[in-house]
């Protein structure tokens, strides 16, 4: 209902949003009324995806007094749509096939999703509290290049409100130069619903960051990471990472599958080392 209310007031796509002058205040009022009507509640352990998907909204956090520009509203909506679509993919348990299984229990699954393509799903358990992962993956996002060798640099280009950012990511070349230099411009949003945190995003356009010479501009499809405390062990975290990506260029599917599944496995290993080697800050998701 909330998303429908926003679409009615603010337009349902980037092209429409550009033409909605004078409607931002109307959208904010309508969304505010809808948020006031909703009763808060936390997700159960068995239905966390459904709960997050149901409660997530374009302005699910408390509305701020400052009204957003048309462009900013378009980015916020795009981030919300990426989150909803990614959670919908995770919610469907059918058709997943194992790509990679590690001795420590980490595993990568994959499936082909209509209108999206092949997606990869990493499932791991991390011996750290959820707030610690959130701090590293969101608050310290720009430091990822320090501990993840698959990432050269992540830069926040624009921050919109509390939940949404536009980022530029420069990926490192893969081992053996199987995949050359790629970069990504993405809209990302982070939300918490009860005991679950969701970090989502997808490719977007940002005029101040055009394509770079010698680097192929790849694109993230609807992507997300879901964090929630492990059942019975609140000091540990279950991390699920849905990866949807178009590397562009002429690459055999076998190479793409190998690179992406290994990238997820490597990410989990590097993240654990980072969390173990760096001090735990006081953070809240």
From Swiss-Prot:
Principal subcellular localisation of the protein: mitochondrion
Pfam families noted in UniProt: START
SUPFAM superfamilies, alphabetized: Bet v1-like
Domain START: 67-280
GO biological process, one term: regulation of steroid biosynthetic process
Organelle transit peptide: 1-63
Catalytic activity line of the entry: cholesterol(in) = cholesterol(out)
PROSITE patterns recorded: START
Cellular localisation: Mitochondrion
TM spans (from-to): none
Gene Ontology CC: one annotated term: mitochondrion
Alphabetically ordered keywords of this record: Lipid transport, Lipid-binding, Mitochondrion, Phosphoprotein, Steroidogenesis, Transit peptide, Transport
Subunit structure: May interact with TSPO.
Protein known as: Steroidogenic acute regulatory protein, mitochondrial
Naturally occurring in which organism (per UniProt): Equus caballus (Horse)
Gene name of the encoded protein: STAR
